[in-house]
Amino acid sequence: YEMLRSLVGSEMCIRDRAYAREDASSFIHKGVIYNIDKTAQALTSIINKLESQLNNSIAKVYVGIGGQSLRTVKNAVSRVLEEEGIISQELVDAISDENLEVPLMDMSVLDVAPQEYKIDNNLQADPVGVAGKRITGNFLNIVARASLKKNLEHSFEQAKVEIADLLIAPIALANAVLTESEMRSGCALVDFGADTTTVSVYKNNILRFLSVLPLGGNNITRDITALQMEEAEAEQLKLKYGDMLYEEEETETPAVCTLEDGRSIELNVLNDIIDARAEEILANVWN
């Protein structure tokens, strides 16, 4: 189920001091806010719960932004100098500013991951101080539907909660769980969520690709309901017995789980359903 979650940490590290959540499945879907009023009410409830646990007031919050429309778009900006010279910081800043002017239909740039700069025929991570006549800046723009950020800000404003900073959730996650060595040598971080799966690719300590797929754990839950049960019970079975690496033991009596209505379901049947959908999600990740 879609949930609004909040965690209060301390001393600039992941240290749980307070935690609260609210069911948001009726007004947030695949990370997108569809009802600002209800979202604001849920935020107010979460803040009240956290302040009660902390016995203190919350002045500002850091907010992770994600959602189905979040993705990366490549862009390149070139400048040709009148004569060969030294690339200045001012020129690099001007190229970066021009990159933000790229027209995007119904989308907005949330952040930028500079890739490399090409000076004449040579690639440079830091072009300032390099001699050349032509410079091309390659950028990876992190974009999303303009309404994604707007609705998020409106919800917090209506809840009278001040945002200290908006963080790109997949990037914040990568910074928390990936090592510098992993980012440098190259890796993909796959975050399986309830309604979406996020893929982030890193190489040479730089984000190279980001995409949010509209598939997640809830798809598996809905598949399990085909065994004639409610979604809530399907979710419980998935969490308790689900195992994508499940291998049936060769016994006369197969392992089973018992449903609320007394029926029994073989674990291999349950896990075949889970495995089929998980394979589909992973196939989309690799593609």
Predicted regions and their residues:
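A short, acidic, amphipathic alpha-helical segment used as a generic capping/interface helix at domain edges
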Residues: 280-287
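A generic local structural motif
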Residues: 1, 173-177, 287
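Residue-level signature of catalytic and energy-coupling elements of molecular machines
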Residues: 6, 63, 156, 191, ...
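Conserved adenosine/adenylate-binding substructure
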Residues: 275-279
